[in-house]
């Protein structure tokens, strides 16, 4: 008989056995339920982590697309790494006004609000990544720029976009999806 790992299938199989049966805490069926529950929790946590990573990547690319499609840069076909560095800095500093406002609003003897802590942690993490190499679309390639300008904002087409890593000095660092 095949081993069932899915929690829903396991629960369904147990309910088929008979009327409302109780499972002994040290029994074989209970251990199966515990393993299946732990497995479901682990899979859900990995899915959430992966989804969060994709959302952050999508936000970066969308920000770059908005900058590139703005009226100021509409006619420029490609950008060098120095321009890309400036765009990344503006992306990292996008919440600085709200962060400063939250710091001013907070009284001196009170702990920071959850929103302030969240914004500060995100900013610190992005700055740390920027020093090592910030993952962003390659704006120095004409084909990539054309694709970025016409990108519809979906996850599926994001894989065809060439990404590179730019550090805080404006140099390309080894990495990305090249």
Swiss-Prot record:
Keywords: Nucleus. The keyword Metal-binding does not apply. It is found in: Nucleus. GO terms for cellular component: nucleus. Its main location: nucleus. Belongs to the TMA16 family. Present with 5350 molecules/cell in log phase SD medium. This is Translation machinery-associated protein 16. It comes from Saccharomyces cerevisiae (strain ATCC 204508 / S288c) (Baker's yeast).
């Amino acid at each position: 008989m095949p081993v069932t790992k899915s929690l829903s299938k396991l629960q369904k199989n147990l309910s088929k056995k008979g009327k409302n049966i109780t499972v002994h805490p040290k029994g074989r069926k209970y251990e199966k339920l515990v393993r299946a529950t732990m497995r479901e929790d682990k899979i859900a946590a990995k899915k959430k982590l992966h989804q969060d990573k994709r959302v952050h990547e999508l936000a970066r690319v969308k920000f770059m697309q908005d900058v590139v499609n703005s009226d100021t840069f509409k006619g420029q076909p490609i950008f060098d790494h120095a321009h890309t560095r400036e765009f990344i800095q503006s992306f990292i500093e996008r919440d600085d006004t709200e962060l400063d406002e939250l710091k001013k609003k907070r009284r001196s003897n009170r702990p920071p609000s959850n929103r302030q802590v969240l914004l500060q942690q995100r900013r610190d993490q992005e700055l740390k990544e920027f020093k090592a190499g910030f993952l962003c679309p390659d704006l120095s390639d004409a084909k990539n720029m054309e694709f970025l300008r016409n990108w519809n904002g979906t996850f599926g087409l994001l894989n065809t976009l060439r990404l590179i890593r730019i550090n805080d000095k404006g140099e390309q660092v080894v990495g990305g999806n090249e």
